[in-house]
Amino acid sequence: MLQQAERRIPPFRRRKSTPHEQRLSHHSSNNNNNIDSMSKAIAQYTEDGVHAVFEQSGESGRSFNYSESIRIASESVPEQQITAYLVKIQRGGFIQPFGSMIAVDEPSFRILGYSDNARDMLGITPQSVPSLDDKNDAAFALGPQSVPSLDDKNDAAFALGTDVRALFTHSSALLLEKAFSAREISLMNPIWIHSRTSGKPFYGILHRIDVGIVIDLEPARTEDPALSIAGAVQSQEALVRAISQLQSLPSADVKLLCDTVVESVRELTGYDRVMVYKFHEDEHGEVVSESKRPDLEPYIGLHYPATDIPQASRFLFKQNRVRMIVDCHASAVRVVQDEALVQPLCLVGSTLGAPHGCHAQYMANMGSIASLVMAVIINGNDEEGVGGRSSMRLWGLVVCHHTSARCIPFPLRYACEFLMQAFGLQLNMELQLAAQSLEKRVLRTQTLLCDMLLRDSPTGIVTQSPSIMDLVKCDGAALYFQGNYYPLGVTPTEAQIRDIIEWLLAFHGDSTGLSTDSLGDAGYPGLPRLGMQFVGWQVAYITEKDFLFWFRSHTAKEIKWGGAKLILRTRMMGQRMHPLSSFKAFLEVVKSRSLPWENAEMDAIHSLQLILRDSFKDAEHRNSKAVVDPHVSEQELQGVDELSSVAREMVRLIETATAPIFAVDVDGHVNGWNAKVSELTGLPVEEAMGKSLVHDLVFKESEETVNKLLSREEDKNVETKMRTFGKEHQNKAAFLVVNACSSKHFTNNVVGVCFVGQNVTGQKIVMHKFINIQGDYKAIVHSPNPLIPPIFASDDNTCCLEWNTAMEKLDPSNENVTVGGVDVIGKMLVGEVFGSCCQLKGSDSITKFMIVLHNALGGQDTDKFPFSFLDRHGKYVQTFLTANKRVNMEGQIIGAFCFLQIMSPELQQALKAQRQQEKEFLGRMKELAYICQGVKKPLSGIRFTNSLLEATSLTNEQKQFLETSVACEKQMLKIIRDVDLESIEDGSLELEKGEFLLGNVINAVVSQVILLLRERNLQLIRDIPEEIKTLAVYGDQLRIQQVLSDFLLNIVRYAPSPDGWVEIHVRPRIKQISDGLTLLHAEFRMVCPGEGLPPELIQDMFNNSRWGTQEGLGLSMSRKILKLMNGEVQYIREAERCYFYVLLELPVTRRSSKKC
């Protein structure tokens, strides 16, 4: 519909998903969503590949029905046809006629290809250029040839193999040489160059391709204000105003943000219509904001099929984020290239790429002649990133249309690209806030529902407010509980629900639920009887007989047309490519689908599902919990000693910290004062204690700021001016930038405020002298004194005015870390100094730096802005940037001062180590996810095999073997599904309790070490009472198996070998607590002779924060899981043996209680 890149007609609908593909997978919803999104994109490539349909129809004279093409069933497309389509998209061989292009070999400057109009644009007469038909002419030879003289205009030959520098003036040739040598050539754009023959000026826009460098030449007017420094600054100021307007908008309003950006773009560019076009999760698009001429019909609210903008075009938008069509009726210009090249020249990064015929026809049908399209890029999902970096995602497009031919000069397009980067950053924050807001709302609703479940029966979640309909956006919801039907909103009848339940149990009985936006595609045969108001379903299984339902109607009901309906006109346009026919085609596709269910909604449903399951189980075993729960408080008392030890260690660290740290009580009196604060203020700790922070220790100008912090308003990076004491500090001040946080008692009551600071006194003194023009200006700026921070300054045109000695040598300990000095004076700080000389990390960094600089020129200071760049030697320099305005004697702003605070080597090393750890952690997590996913399939096969064996006639011994195999298989599946160490660490792991035989657990645990025992030639001694094998208890069987097997496996692993032994003792004690409640007090001992486990492994096991080995991690997690089950473990070393001593209490079921 709106894409600027080459577009294709969307002829085919996607393949229907199988029922299995519609199943809900709660444990990997995000990952599955990414895979599903990728699958949709790949599937669309196939659909896009039938690109020749429209082109062939035009060549043959046959009619092409656009709307009908959407409804054609998906067919197999030959791979060659898809490849040809992608090649045509990227290497089409034609450009738009408003400019010309030349492709050049990078090292030799020889021309590899050019557009047919290049001669005319450069003013080179045909007489000076040999004919293309003369194959033998030396001027077209592809080997080495003499380069025409740069001093003789009449020698300017234009042909393949010519030195491109000969076509331009001497100064232009020097600019080209400089640009070719740049590491990031795009930062040099645009280059103002002149034709050597005609003297005409051009914007030279350069980018690298696989065979060399492409030079796009766009004619420039000599009076164009963008060519002057003042004009460039004026464009930058207009851009910064637009960006500042975006940043000043109230948060949590994406619609307002989009409305503002279309108004700003229209004001900057002057197009008749500007739209924000958003891509939805299912790849289709929607116009969500629009600014237009009053007489134009609106497109806001229109939705379009995913194939209206092909995946190849979306990929191109990530590479070249701004694309322009000047006149869709203009004939494209052919590109001539060297026959020795293997494939056509790549025009992906070209500003001149010609649109395909279908897109030109589409624009003509909608009355649009010119267009400008800009990509909106935001952060993608972390797991999609490479090398630990977040991936980037194409969120949508900002699309400009004009009813007549229109050409926007490159500098203005470049400014719009910066605006899109700022828009993307702001949009990313707004989307994160919206996601957090949704999550909080869902959590709040879940909390209220949980409260209902605790106080009332499960039916309260449908009979009271809030209800399950408030949990997710839906048209109706229902609870089917104990054979009764409780509907809410628009719902199917009870008979229809019963029919659905039968179908679910028959075809989806082995899943935890169903999630689909099309019940028909999920395979339900009775959809015609239900109607279109129930096409989207969410089903959560609570038990085998109890279910939760949510319903959504078809998407077409939600889609609204922003202007006149124009139904008759739509019918007339059904066969033409037009927004209305795209809209009609989209409605045809989605009339049997609902809005997709979002990940947050599915997570909320899954959480409620688990809560209800536990609620049902807890209702059955309420008495057991009443007895077991008091032991939690005993464990909390046992942890007091550990907490006290940790507290003492924290106090010691605070007292010896190199950062100033102090604290006050609720009355504002000092009750904590470390050595660093004493050093900075000259006030010993014994004198500081009890003083009032506001009245005794800070200057008057900081009193209001400190009072706010004492009113329990937690804040970061707050500057305070502290008083100093003693002769050495007399009449001086200490400046601290502090983070303030509340200090809380163990009862969670606020008892004071803690301040963690950073000393910025030296920097503040220098800044004060600069801003007030105190002292000797030159002496301070260029002083080699190490106390002087790196400083650079700009004039009001953002050109470099000062660059002090500390800037030239950022790290005194490293003589090689230099970024230049005299040669940066006079250059643009944005683009030339920081961009070309000192490379920044990506275009987003350039945008942020430009905003900081212009804010300072506008009187808005910036403090502690993270600023990193590569120096000339490729060394990564990490700093904090402070930018302040420069004023003259009359108080007028004449520029900006910038101060850099260098991160210490220790901090850099720590950050580097942290990034490396995060990278390794991400790699490990991906490996773990891959292993977990891969293991599930063979486990499923084992489960199936076991189920077949269960159906056969087996001896008692064979049945025992089978039960052990099933228990081990379930234990492994449990571990794989719940790889959540954080929930184990914080004690929130969900236990799945049930009745089981303790003997089965012992058999499963022993079976897991038998092979290792044989391998190490060890004897296993069992001391297990016979009665324990048939004892039925209540608890989490699989977690108990996991814990005991881990302890026993480590004993076997470190028992002396060969001819050693391992012994397992089990000692049960039955306690009668009350009528109907019996507890088993079980003692397990896993024993081996000798020294046993290494001491460092035991340290890992009992260390709460760090571990050094995989075995240590496993033991630590097992200990914590055991603690969650009200158990405990000790490792005891005696003279000749060592062993794990495990205590565990489990409720005995009534069946076993009667036997006892």
UniProtKB/Swiss-Prot annotation:
<comment type="function">
    <text>Regulatory photoreceptor which exists in two forms that are reversibly interconvertible by light: the Pr form that absorbs maximally in the red region of the spectrum and the Pfr form that absorbs maximally in the far-red region. Photoconversion of Pr to Pfr induces an array of morphogenic responses, whereas reconversion of Pfr to Pr cancels the induction of those responses. Pfr controls the expression of a number of nuclear genes including those encoding the small subunit of ribulose-bisphosphate carboxylase, chlorophyll A/B binding protein, protochlorophyllide reductase, rRNA, etc.</text>
</comment>
<dbReference type="InterPro" id="IPR013767">
    <property type="entry name" value="PAS_fold"/>
</dbReference>
<dbReference type="InterPro" id="IPR013516">
    <property type="entry name" value="Phyto_chromo_BS"/>
</dbReference>
<dbReference type="InterPro" id="IPR044767">
    <property type="entry name" value="Phy_HATPase-like"/>
</dbReference>
<dbReference type="Pfam" id="PF00989">
    <property type="entry name" value="PAS"/>
</dbReference>
<keyword id="KW-0675">Receptor</keyword>
<comment type="subunit">
    <text>Homodimer.</text>
</comment>
<keyword id="KW-0804">Transcription</keyword>
<dbReference type="InterPro" id="IPR012129">
    <property type="entry name" value="Phytochrome_A-E"/>
</dbReference>
<dbReference type="InterPro" id="IPR035965">
    <property type="entry name" value="PAS-like_dom_sf"/>
</dbReference>
<dbReference type="InterPro" id="IPR003661">
    <property type="entry name" value="HisK_dim/P_dom"/>
</dbReference>
<dbReference type="InterPro" id="IPR043150">
    <property type="entry name" value="Phytochrome_PHY_sf"/>
</dbReference>
<dbReference type="GO" id="GO:0009584">
    <property type="term" value="P:detection of visible light"/>
</dbReference>
<dbReference type="Pfam" id="PF08446">
    <property type="entry name" value="PAS_2"/>
</dbReference>
<dbReference type="InterPro" id="IPR013654">
    <property type="entry name" value="PAS_2"/>
</dbReference>
<dbReference type="GO" id="GO:0000155">
    <property type="term" value="F:phosphorelay sensor kinase activity"/>
</dbReference>
<keyword id="KW-0600">Photoreceptor protein</keyword>
<keyword id="KW-0716">Sensory transduction</keyword>
<feature type="region of interest" description="Disordered">
    <location>
        <begin position="1"/>
        <end position="35"/>
    </location>
</feature>
<dbReference type="GO" id="GO:0005634">
    <property type="term" value="C:nucleus"/>
</dbReference>
<dbReference type="InterPro" id="IPR003018">
    <property type="entry name" value="GAF"/>
</dbReference>
<feature type="domain" description="GAF">
    <location>
        <begin position="253"/>
        <end position="431"/>
    </location>
</feature>
<dbReference type="GO" id="GO:0009881">
    <property type="term" value="F:photoreceptor activity"/>
</dbReference>
<dbReference type="InterPro" id="IPR016132">
    <property type="entry name" value="Phyto_chromo_attachment"/>
</dbReference>
<feature type="domain" description="Histidine kinase">
    <location>
        <begin position="930"/>
        <end position="1150"/>
    </location>
</feature>
<keyword id="KW-0805">Transcription regulation</keyword>
<protein>
    <recommendedName>
        <fullName>Phytochrome B</fullName>
    </recommendedName>
</protein>
<dbReference type="GO" id="GO:0042803">
    <property type="term" value="F:protein homodimerization activity"/>
</dbReference>
<feature type="binding site" description="covalent">
    <location>
        <position position="358"/>
    </location>
    <ligand>
        <name>phytochromobilin</name>
    </ligand>
</feature>
<dbReference type="GO" id="GO:0009585">
    <property type="term" value="P:red, far-red light phototransduction"/>
</dbReference>
<feature type="domain" description="PAS 1">
    <location>
        <begin position="646"/>
        <end position="717"/>
    </location>
</feature>
<dbReference type="InterPro" id="IPR029016">
    <property type="entry name" value="GAF-like_dom_sf"/>
</dbReference>
<comment type="similarity">
    <text>Belongs to the phytochrome family.</text>
</comment>
<dbReference type="InterPro" id="IPR001294">
    <property type="entry name" value="Phytochrome"/>
</dbReference>
<dbReference type="GO" id="GO:0006355">
    <property type="term" value="P:regulation of DNA-templated transcription"/>
</dbReference>
<dbReference type="InterPro" id="IPR000014">
    <property type="entry name" value="PAS"/>
</dbReference>
<keyword id="KW-0607">Phytochrome signaling pathway</keyword>
<dbReference type="InterPro" id="IPR013515">
    <property type="entry name" value="Phytochrome_cen-reg"/>
</dbReference>
<dbReference type="Pfam" id="PF00360">
    <property type="entry name" value="PHY"/>
</dbReference>
<feature type="domain" description="PAS 2">
    <location>
        <begin position="776"/>
        <end position="853"/>
    </location>
</feature>
<keyword id="KW-0157">Chromophore</keyword>
<dbReference type="InterPro" id="IPR036890">
    <property type="entry name" value="HATPase_C_sf"/>
</dbReference>
